[in-house]
Amino acid sequence: MSSELTPLQRSVLDKYRFLAESLRELSETLSDLNNTHEDSKPEAILQEMREIEVKISLVSTLLKGSVYSLVIQRRMDHQQKPSDL
């Protein structure tokens, strides 16, 4: 049957196979996480998630500040170059 498939059909089937494998791996990972934190209280897990959220927010703010600084610096460099000519 596979010899009757077009290249596009083979490609789609390969992508579905890859997706199925990824979902299986995700399911195993989630199962492992559930078993690992079986003894943890929901409040403790929630507190850990809040701490992670704060850290992610801080990293995001620092990244935005860095990008903004680079944009301003390039804009200033660009404005200075034409005046030097």
From Swiss-Prot:
<keyword id="KW-0131">Cell cycle</keyword>
<dbReference type="InterPro" id="IPR013965">
    <property type="entry name" value="DASH_Dad3"/>
</dbReference>
<keyword id="KW-0206">Cytoskeleton</keyword>
<dbReference type="Pfam" id="PF08656">
    <property type="entry name" value="DASH_Dad3"/>
</dbReference>
<keyword id="KW-0137">Centromere</keyword>
<dbReference type="GO" id="GO:1990976">
    <property type="term" value="P:protein transport along microtubule to mitotic spindle pole body"/>
</dbReference>
<protein>
    <recommendedName>
        <fullName>DASH complex subunit DAD3</fullName>
    </recommendedName>
</protein>
<comment type="similarity">
    <text>Belongs to the DASH complex DAD3 family.</text>
</comment>
<feature type="coiled-coil region">
    <location>
        <begin position="13"/>
        <end position="41"/>
    </location>
</feature>
<dbReference type="GO" id="GO:0072686">
    <property type="term" value="C:mitotic spindle"/>
</dbReference>
<keyword id="KW-0159">Chromosome partition</keyword>
<keyword id="KW-0498">Mitosis</keyword>
<dbReference type="GO" id="GO:1990758">
    <property type="term" value="P:mitotic sister chromatid biorientation"/>
</dbReference>
<dbReference type="GO" id="GO:0008608">
    <property type="term" value="P:attachment of spindle microtubules to kinetochore"/>
</dbReference>
<dbReference type="GO" id="GO:0051301">
    <property type="term" value="P:cell division"/>
</dbReference>
<keyword id="KW-0539">Nucleus</keyword>
<comment type="subunit">
    <text>Component of the DASH complex consisting of ASK1, DAD1, DAD2, DAD3, DAD4, DAM1, DUO1, HSK3, SPC19 and SPC34, with a stoichiometry of one copy of each subunit per complex. Multiple DASH complexes oligomerize to form a ring that encircles spindle microtubules and organizes the rod-like NDC80 complexes of the outer kinetochore. DASH complex oligomerization strengthens microtubule attachments. On cytoplasmic microtubules, DASH complexes appear to form patches instead of rings.</text>
</comment>
<dbReference type="GO" id="GO:0005737">
    <property type="term" value="C:cytoplasm"/>
</dbReference>
<keyword id="KW-0963">Cytoplasm</keyword>
<dbReference type="GO" id="GO:0005874">
    <property type="term" value="C:microtubule"/>
</dbReference>
<keyword id="KW-0132">Cell division</keyword>
<keyword id="KW-0175">Coiled coil</keyword>
<keyword id="KW-0995">Kinetochore</keyword>
<keyword id="KW-0493">Microtubule</keyword>
<keyword id="KW-0158">Chromosome</keyword>
<dbReference type="GO" id="GO:0051010">
    <property type="term" value="F:microtubule plus-end binding"/>
</dbReference>
<comment type="function">
    <text>Component of the DASH complex that connects microtubules with kinetochores and couples microtubule depolymerisation to chromosome movement; it is involved in retrieving kinetochores to the spindle poles before their re-orientation on the spindle in early mitosis and allows microtubule depolymerization to pull chromosomes apart and resist detachment during anaphase.</text>
</comment>
<dbReference type="GO" id="GO:0042729">
    <property type="term" value="C:DASH complex"/>
</dbReference>
